[in-house]
Amino acid sequence: MQKLTILLLVAAVLMSTQALNQEQHQRAKINLLSKRKPPAERWWRWGGCMLWFGRCTKDSECCSNSCDRTYCELARFPSDW
């Protein structure tokens, strides 16, 4: 009877350890996925600035340093245009 009790206790400890490990793995996976940027944002952002045709509100947000208040332009147009 004592051997059966010890066996049941060991089984319970092993099962609870496995459940705890799975929970921590799931939590780590959720944290990793929540830190990812949406695919479109990853594609348009490069080095902290927006590439051509990315959304912007000011020139400094664009790699080309040229924002038309909506999207980044490919290059800055000459001022006489």
UniProtKB/Swiss-Prot annotation:
What are its GO cellular component terms? extracellular region
Which residues are propeptide? 20-42
Q: List the InterPro entries.
A: Conotoxin
* Tissues showing expression: Expressed by the venom duct.
Q: What is its main location?
A: secreted
Q: Which residues form the signal peptide?
A: 1-19
What are the alphabetically sorted keywords of the record?
Disulfide bond, Ion channel impairing toxin, Knottin, Neurotoxin, Secreted, Signal, Toxin
Q: What does this protein do?
A: Gamma-conotoxins may act on voltage-gated non-specific cation pacemaker channels (HCN).
Q: Which family does the record assign?
A: Belongs to the conotoxin O2 superfamily.
Q: What is known of its domains?
A: The presence of a 'disulfide through disulfide knot' structurally defines this protein as a knottin.
Q: What is this protein called?
A: Gamma-conotoxin-like TeA53
Naturally occurring in which organism (per UniProt): Conus textile
